[in-house]
Amino acid sequence: MNTGNRIGIFGGSFDPIHTGHVLVSVYTLEILDLDRLIVVPVFNPPHKKTVAPFEKRFEWLKKVFEGMEKVEVSDYEKGRGGVSYSIFTIEYFSEIYKTKPFFIVGEDALSYFEKWYRYRDILEKSTLVVYPRYCGKPYHEHARRVLGDLSEIVFLDMPIVQISSTEIRERARIGKTLKGFVPEEIREEVEVFYGA
């Protein structure tokens, strides 16, 4: 199936996108030597609600990644409709590019990955790539217990990303600056949107 295309899928709520997401994108492109990184904002997440509507989050992503070589922002999950399960997105882009894509998640996802819809299929149909978010030992131990062999999972060697969208929304709500937390292209708009 693999045609030589090295494709990464980076999904998330991006509510809002922050500098940590941008760092993950840059390091992922470099470390995995990707031909293309597809950033996919979730449309209808199965386990949590988003604050900002899809259109707003999609618009912010487009602004931030505009001009960044090899990055594409996709509205696939909106077009597909229904609940946004990652396996459907993986299968879709796998078929489009005729390759087994890399699927990028934060290391906190390892603590509940077995609860993801068709998680075994995700592991079979993509190469799981994990970026650091905290000191990851407990997550790795849990994943080892539940998933078994982790040798097929790629753990990115990059700085730990500790910024969270939840923290950003809270900062905006109480009127604190988001300088350094979100890209400058969208900072003022994000401050106003989530502000009290």
Swiss-Prot record:
What EC number is given for this enzyme?
2.7.7.18
List the catalytic activities from the record.
nicotinate beta-D-ribonucleotide + ATP + H(+) = deamido-NAD(+) + diphosphate
Extract the InterPro entries matched here: Cyt_trans-like, NadD/NMNAT, Rossmann-like_a/b/a_fold
The molecular function terms of the Gene Ontology recorded here are: ATP binding; nicotinate-nucleotide adenylyltransferase activity
Keywords from UniProt, A to Z, are: ATP-binding, NAD, Nucleotide-binding, Nucleotidyltransferase, Pyridine nucleotide biosynthesis, Transferase
What pathway is this protein said to act in by its record? Cofactor biosynthesis; NAD(+) biosynthesis; deamido-NAD(+) from nicotinate D-ribonucleotide: step 1/1
Top EC group: transferase
Q: Which GO terms describe its biological process?
A: NAD biosynthetic process
Tell me which positions the record assigns to the signal sequence.
Answer: none
Superkingdom: Bacteria
Q: Which CDD domains match?
A: NMNAT
Which Pfam families does this entry report, sorted A to Z? CTP_transf_like (PF01467)
PANTHER family in alphabetical order: NICOTINATE-NUCLEOTIDE ADENYLYLTRANSFERASE-RELATED, PHOSPHOPANTETHEINE ADENYLYLTRANSFERASE
Q: Which family does it belong to?
A: Belongs to the NadD family.
Role description: Catalyzes the reversible adenylation of nicotinate mononucleotide (NaMN) to nicotinic acid adenine dinucleotide (NaAD).
Q: Which HAMAP family match?
A: NaMN_adenylyltr
Q: What is this protein called?
A: Probable nicotinate-nucleotide adenylyltransferase
